[in-house]
């Protein structure tokens, strides 16, 4: 499924859209792409 992960880095909030099996994997993929980020939210995209 496609998942929108909202991330926060250095005072900026941005979205990372990833394909993953579940929310946990989506979070891991987004953090692997942006290692210094904090996850704000994880939402499915239809």
Question: Which role fits each region the language model picked out?
Answer:
Residues 16-18:
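Generic detection of short hydrophobic beta-strand segments and adjacent strand-loop junctions
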């Amino acid at each position: 499924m496609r998942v929108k992960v909202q991330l926060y880095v250095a005072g900026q909030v941005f979205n990372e859209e990833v394909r993953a099996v579940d929310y946990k994997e989506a979070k891991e993929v987004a953090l692997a792409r942006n290692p210094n980020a904090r996850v704000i939210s994880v939402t499915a995209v239809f």
